[in-house]
């Protein structure tokens, strides 16, 4: 009976120790976190294309407003309304991009706990660099977002004043 209880205790301890070996490694968890961040940004490429198209359209409208405003004020009013709608659309796309990048940033922040658990220093340094790059990118986007948003507000004011 004593022999059986010792065997049971050793088996239980072995199972407990081995359970830690079979759980997900920090490297795997980190990979998943970075993958999730990348998935959050998936729509940003298409949003950037849409924003670019809207910018071109806005520039064309502005040029038409300037040209036609010299000749006919009535046709310009329609163009001014279109231009104001264009700025609103750009604001929506820009906000959507910001939300996607913020979600990605949250995923990157969640990766921090896995980076700390990595034992391989070379891999840890690489993970820190990736994390740092994401953070710098997020900061740069926020600065661009603030400037672009300010520009859109001024553009709207201009179109309102011209009406």
Name these PLM-found stretches:
Residues 1-8:
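Bacterial N-terminal signal peptides that target proteins for export
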Residues 76, 90-163:
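Extended amphipathic alpha-helical interaction segments
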Residues 12-13:
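Classic N-terminal secretory signal peptides
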Residues 16-20:
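C-terminal motif of bacterial Sec signal peptides marking the signal peptidase cleavage site
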Residues 22-95:
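Immediate post-signal-peptide N-terminus of mature secreted/exported proteins
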